[in-house]
């Protein structure tokens, strides 16, 4: 219900904004370099009010980011979203300014950052711009607004950020702060005009601002005779550095970076500050991430650092779920997985918050699964945004590709695109949210994309290269079977959504294709494992796991497949999620946990990094970043297949509870869209106890593990054929 309220509060992403903004104008500064890379512009507008209205809803669109102060009070910290609900459109924000206003004279100041560069999550319009309108205030941006070009904002010295990032490394020269001349703004167009295009209301919350925190630090000297002040942070976070410094002179260059200055193999975001004489405070507004903040300056500089601090910001949701168990390694993993998930959420889902900040859909399918089980329903809006962006960027020929939004990436990764529309992507979103409207929105795009896929002469999914034939990091990837498995799951999702959206006439063809794929896949069974005849590498654990997950492999093959999994470990942390899920589903949960601890153990126990890795070690394949949330997939496996909680009816109106006590004791709370669900079980010798909370308006089907002769619920004999209504239940089971 809460998610329905959230979505109702947002305008539909595929619809134009029917706005009253006809008198508002896009504006920018009168300066020849206003559209260049890393341009900063300040706007100012005075406003006289006879009285403060009860509501002052204000529409703001900016290319690319903005900070808003009203009467000297911060109203928005980093507003705006990276551009691209579709290739030609932009986002706008809505904020109520009434709490910041007063009777009489008011002043609004907006600091605008124009990226001026395409990135892996941003489509550059080519022009800086701001448009503001409030019907409640009679406010509209136009040439009466003052603006100034800000020469104090510059690019930092090398190394510059890698090509994937649209953001620049900021350099702020305080010696020339405020030197730009105030002028009347230049009017550039109306609401909806090019190059910014159609404006779509922001579908996700504003960032959570945790405020500024000062930190203690240590001091060292590096090889270049620079003083390095290092401050350990509580965890990997999105932060903007804050310094308080006195310089006897002026012109000292103070560098600011984190321990994630290189996201594995590539340079990421850092910043510089040039001092003026005297005492000064500065916050560098371009966010970076890491567990350690470093302030670096020449050893011979006559400066005093009074304090180092940071402002943490993050996605506007809460960690309302919880989990503890009797296995401390899994508890440690859970904490790192949640931290990794959160730092990979902002304008979009990310693969990593340092190197790329890109919405790769293989990652998204795993990140959203974790989010549904542990984050408050507000987080579902980021999945909603990701899904609509993916289909709205579909090419005319039907191709889907990611990451999008993007201006510097155009390649299809066929395996990831099938995953995106599969039962782990679009359909999984529907199961957890109940958002049928989005399924109706996306089905035509799914159908067009699936039409690009064909079968070969054997009835198996034909190879589709796309722009990059990527199935996983690592080696020994049986791509023909991997594509076939994802194709099968995408067809399953399409059939489900076709039935939901009154397109049932499409279902027989989807089922025909699935039957053909399953038969051809099983022809690749050699008696002990699956291999495609054209594949000459070591047998791939990924495709054997996918055979189980799809249901293509029947139970008669499970014992042989178990022996296969004991001998093969080729999957990266990305595809390992599906291997572990397959093991649990085939009754080998204990081995799945052993394999999980063996493979993930080093990153779980790593004392430096509070997040999970892209590869099996720091600096491994794929660039080797140390904050890749695809490594958190086991969180979903535990919630769904060990705690045994999954929706039976979309939106958790009905759900099942099938605990699998391969972990002797687990206690999980899920903040579903229907309310909080708690399941806590403990097995001890011949007894098993389960405590369950069923939210109001929902029903639960409970299946107790086999082997118990007496099952009592709240002191009465349990009838497993009956669904449980809302309430609290205690199951006591004995053998």
What annotation goes with each model-predicted range?
Residues 8-21:
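Bacterial Sec-dependent signal peptides at the C-terminal "C-region" and cleavage site
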Residues 19-354, 363, 378-384, 401-408, ...:
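Extracellular/oxidizing-compartment recognition motifs
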Residues 90, 407-411, 468-479, 530-533, ...:
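Short beta-alpha connecting loops at secondary-structure transitions
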Residues 136, 140-144, 292, 302-336, ...:
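Active-site acid/base region of carbohydrate-active enzymes
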Residues 153-171, 590-735:
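Non-catalytic C-terminal accessory modules of carbohydrate-active enzymes
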Residues 538-543, 570-576:
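Generic helix N-cap/helix-start motif at coil->alpha-helix transitions
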Residues 557-564, 596:
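Alpha-helical repeat scaffolds
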Residues 563-570, 600-604:
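Solenoid-like repeat scaffolds
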């Amino acid at each position: 219900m809460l998610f329905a309220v959230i979505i109702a509060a947002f305008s539909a992403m595929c619809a134009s904004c029917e706005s009253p903004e006809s008198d508002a104008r896009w504006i920018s500064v009168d300066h020849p370099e206003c559209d260049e890379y890393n341009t900063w512009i300040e706007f100012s507008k005075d406003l006289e009010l006879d009285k403060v209205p009860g509501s002052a809803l204000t529409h703001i669109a900016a290319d690319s980011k903005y900070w808003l102060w009203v009467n000297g009070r911060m109203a928005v910290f980093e507003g705006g979203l990276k551009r691209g609900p579709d290739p030609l459109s932009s986002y706008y924000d809505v904020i109520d300014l009434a709490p910041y206003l007063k009777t009489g004279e008011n002043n609004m100041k907006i600091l605008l950052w124009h990226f001026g560069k395409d990135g892996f999550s941003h489509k550059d319009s080519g022009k800086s711009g701001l448009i503001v309108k409030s019907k409640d205030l009679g406010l509209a941006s136009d040439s009466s607004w003052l603006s100034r070009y800000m020469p104090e904002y510059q690019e930092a010295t090398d190394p510059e950020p890698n090509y994937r990032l649209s953001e620049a490394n900021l350099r702020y020269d305080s010696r020339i702060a405020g030197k730009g001349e105030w002028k009347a703004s230049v009017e550039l167009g109306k609401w909806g005009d090019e190059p910014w295009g159609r404006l779509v209301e922001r579908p996700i919350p504003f960032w959570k601002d945790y405020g500024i925190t000062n930190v203690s630090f240590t001091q060292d000297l590096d090889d270049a005779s620079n003083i390095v002040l290092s401050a350990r942070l509580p965890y990997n976070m999105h932060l903007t550095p804050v310094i308080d410094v006195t310089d006897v002179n002026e012109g000292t260059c103070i560098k600011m970076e984190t321990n994630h200055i290189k996201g594995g193999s590539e340079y990421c975001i850092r910043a510089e500050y040039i001092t003026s004489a005297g005492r000064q405070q500065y916050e560098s507004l371009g966010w970076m991430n890491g567990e350690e903040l470093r302030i670096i300056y020449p050893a011979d500089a006559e400066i005093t650092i009074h304090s180092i601090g940071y402002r943490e910001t993050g996605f506007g949701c809460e960690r309302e779920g919880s989990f503890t168990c009797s296995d401390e390694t899994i508890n440690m993993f859970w904490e790192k997985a949640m931290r990794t998930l959160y730092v990979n959420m902002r304008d979009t889902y990310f693969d990593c918050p340092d190197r790329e900040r890109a919405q790769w859909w293989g990652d998204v399918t795993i990140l959203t699964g974790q989010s549904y089980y542990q984050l408050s329903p507000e987080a579902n809006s980021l999945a909603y945004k990701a899904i609509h962006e993916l289909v709205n960027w579909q090419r005319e020929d039907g191709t889907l590709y990611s990451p999008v939004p993007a201006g510097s990436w155009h390649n299809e990764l066929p395996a990831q695109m099938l995953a995106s529309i599969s039962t782990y992507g679009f359909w999984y979103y529907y199961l957890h949210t109940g958002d049928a409207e989005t399924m109706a929105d996306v089905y035509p795009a799914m159908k067009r994309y699936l039409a690009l896929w064909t079968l070969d002469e054997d009835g198996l999914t034909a190879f589709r290269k796309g722009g990059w034939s990527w199935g996983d990091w690592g080696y020994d990837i049986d791509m023909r079977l991997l594509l076939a498995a994802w194709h099968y799951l995408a067809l399953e999702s399409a059939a489900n959504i076709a039935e939901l959206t009154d397109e049932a006439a499409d279902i027989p063809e989807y089922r025909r294709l699935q039957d053909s794929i399953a038969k051809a896949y099983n022809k690749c069974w050699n008696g002990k494992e699956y291999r495609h005849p054209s594949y000459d590498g070591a047998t791939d654990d990924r495709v054997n796991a996918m055979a189980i997950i799809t249901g293509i492999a029947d139970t008669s093959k499970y014992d042989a497949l178990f022996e296969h999994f004991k001998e093969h470990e080729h999957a990266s942390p990305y595809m390992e999620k599906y291997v572990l899920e397959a093991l649990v589903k085939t009754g080998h949960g204990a081995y799945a946990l052993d394999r999980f601890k063996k493979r993930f153990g080093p990153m779980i126990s790593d004392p430096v990094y509070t997040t999970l890795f892209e590869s099996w070690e720091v600096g491994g394949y794929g660039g080797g970043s140390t904050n890749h949330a695809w490594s958190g997939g086991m969180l979903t496996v535990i919630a769904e297949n060990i705690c045994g909680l999954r929706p039976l009816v979309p939106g958790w109106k009905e759900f099942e509870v099938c605990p699998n006590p391969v972990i002797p004791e687990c206690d999980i709370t899920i903040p579903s869209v229907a309310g909080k669900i708690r399941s806590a079980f403990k097995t001890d010798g011949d007894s098993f106890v389960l405590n369950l909370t069923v939210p109001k308006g929902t029903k639960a089907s409970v299946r107790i593990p086999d082997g118990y002769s007496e099952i009592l619920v709240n002191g009465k004999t349990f009838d497993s054929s009956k669904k449980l209504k809302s309430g609290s239940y205690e199951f006591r089971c004995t053998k």
